[in-house]
């Protein structure tokens, strides 16, 4: 159900509270998921005119789970705070003295419900942390992370019995990784259609038993960061080592991600240097180039009255990854009506060369390769 449809069914006197939750409500580490409401119901009689829903189920993303809490207002007394039912978490009993925004409920503040939900989620986090006492090993993992503020202050935990019959205990740690994304080139961050939200990397580590013999890590990137780093398949984190600890494993993943970010930033500046060198060396032979991301360059060149194009595609992780050179005859066509072309990646190249050296080496390679390309174009293409 979309937020607008849901709000149209809410009692008008309660609408400001719920609107703040579903439109602006981001609670916890996962900034890519908003709060949402379902199961709208009314405690009013059927004779009540207009929208009258005053109770609903609130879905809250937390540590890779979705908490489903029932929130119950009274549409006849909209200035009163709501009641809460915590679904399957019957053992969760919040401390009323710590719910300041509930104790001093201010119906003139449209964010008062959201503020209470945030306080409840904080208490729920403490409740989940306390459950780790059932496993000394998992409690050790938690306490060692807690000693490091960069991890301890950005962590969510979901713990409990995976199987009520066997009593088997499991837990999931969700950590917001302290990785700086601020220097990623803006052109890489703008091609995401949806609301990008915060640029964030979350590491989920699931312990399937209390002794940590089965541990499954997974990395989640916000949409813009995933796009900037080359898609979901571009980053593979290492398996959790047998006998390893989170306090050792998490920094390794942070370093891996930081290195990826640095590769992308370096690649952008190196591509710009590369294209600037080609503009200098080939001058009027440059037909077009990508002036934003510096990922493409096209040259129109001539060798002994034979005109040809060279399309250069520079990869995201340039100069580590070698550019592709595609030679294209301006005279010859394939059977499908396309200009005859050949792509080359087997040519002299070193990622250690600067842009000027790469341009000089490319010019020398063109002179050696064009004769055989011309011969192939005449042999295989059609005029």
Swiss-Prot record:
Q: Write out the entry's keywords from A to Z.
A: Apoptosis, Cell cycle, Cell division, Chromatin regulator, Cytoplasm, DNA damage, DNA repair, Mitosis, Nucleus, Repeat, Ubl conjugation pathway
GO cellular component, alphabetical, reads: BRCA1-A complex; BRISC complex; cytoplasm; nucleus
Q: Where is the segment annotated UEV-like 2? A: 275-364
Where is it chiefly localized? cytoplasm
Gene Ontology terms describing biological process: apoptotic process; cell division; chromatin organization; double-strand break repair; mitotic G2 DNA damage checkpoint signaling; positive regulation of DNA repair; response to ionizing radiation
Q: Which Pfam families match?
A: BRE
Output one GO MF annotation: polyubiquitin modification-dependent protein binding
**Location of region: UEV-like 1:** 30-147
**Compartmental location:** Cytoplasm; Nucleus
Q: Return the InterPro entries for the record.
A: BRE
Provide the family line.
Belongs to the BABAM2 family.
Q: What does this protein do?
A: Component of the BRCA1-A complex, a complex that specifically recognizes 'Lys-63'-linked ubiquitinated histones H2A and H2AX at DNA lesions sites, leading to target the BRCA1-BARD1 heterodimer to sites of DNA damage at double-strand breaks (DSBs). The BRCA1-A complex also possesses deubiquitinase activity that specifically removes 'Lys-63'-linked ubiquitin on histones H2A and H2AX.
Q: How does it assemble?
A: Component of the ARISC complex, at least composed of UIMC1/RAP80, ABRAXAS1, BRCC3/BRCC36, BABAM2 and BABAM1/NBA1. Component of the BRCA1-A complex, at least composed of BRCA1, BARD1, UIMC1/RAP80, ABRAXAS1, BRCC3/BRCC36, BABAM2 and BABAM1/NBA1. In the BRCA1-A complex, interacts directly with ABRAXAS1, BRCC3/BRCC36 and BABAM1/NBA1. Binds polyubiquitin. Component of the BRISC complex, at least composed of ABRAXAS2, BRCC3/BRCC36, BABAM2 and BABAM1/NBA1. Identified in a complex with SHMT2 and the other subunits of the BRISC complex.
> Can you quote the domain comment?
Contains 2 ubiquitin-conjugating enzyme family-like (UEV-like) regions. These regions lack the critical Cys residues required for ubiquitination but retain the ability to bind ubiquitin.
Q: What is this protein called?
A: BRISC and BRCA1-A complex member 2
């Amino acid at each position: 159900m979309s937020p607008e449809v849901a709000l149209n069914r809410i009692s008008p006197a309660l609408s400001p509270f719920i609107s703040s939750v579903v439109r602006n409500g981001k609670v916890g580490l996962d900034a890519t998921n908003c709060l949402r409401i379902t199961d709208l119901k009314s405690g009013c009689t059927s004779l009540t005119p207009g929208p009258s829903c005053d109770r609903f189920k609130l879905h809250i993303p937390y540590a890779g789970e979705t908490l489903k809490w029932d929130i119950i207002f009274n549409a006849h007394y909209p200035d009163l705070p709501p009641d809460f039912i915590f679904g399957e978490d019957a053992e969760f009993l919040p401390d009323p003295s710590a719910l300041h925004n509930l104790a001093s409920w201010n119906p003139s503040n449209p964010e008062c419900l959201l503020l209470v939900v945030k306080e409840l989620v904080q208490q729920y986090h403490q409740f989940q942390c306390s459950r780790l006492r059932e496993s000394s090993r998992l409690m050790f993992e938690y306490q060692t992370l807690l000693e490091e503020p960069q991890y301890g202050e950005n962590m969510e935990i979901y713990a409990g019995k995976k199987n009520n019959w066997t009593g088997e205990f499991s837990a999931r740690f969700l950590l917001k990784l302290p990785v700086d994304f601020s220097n990623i080139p803006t052109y890489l961050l703008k091609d995401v259609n949806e609301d990008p939200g915060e640029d964030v990397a979350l590491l989920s580590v699931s312990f399937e038993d209390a002794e940590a013999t089965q541990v499954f890590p997974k990395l989640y990137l916000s949409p813009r960061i995933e796009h900037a780093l080359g898609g979901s398949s571009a980053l593979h984190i290492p398996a959790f080592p047998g006998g390893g600890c989170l306090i050792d494993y998490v920094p390794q993943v942070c370093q891996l991600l930081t290195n990826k970010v640095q590769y992308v930033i370096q690649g952008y500046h190196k591509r710009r240097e590369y294209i600037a060198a080609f503009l200098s060396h080939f001058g009027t032979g440059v037909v077009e180039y990508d002036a934003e991301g510096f990922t493409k360059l096209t040259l129109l060149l001539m060798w002994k009255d034979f005109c040809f194009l060279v399309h250069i595609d520079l990869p995201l992780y340039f100069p580590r990854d070698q550019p592709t050179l595609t030679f294209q005859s301006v005279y010859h066509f394939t059977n499908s009506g396309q200009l005859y072309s050949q792509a080359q990646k087997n040519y002299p190249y070193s990622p250690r060369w600067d842009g000027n050296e790469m341009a000089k080496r490319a010019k020398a390679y063109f002179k050696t390769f064009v004769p055989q390309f011309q011969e192939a174009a005449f042999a295989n293409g059609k005029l």
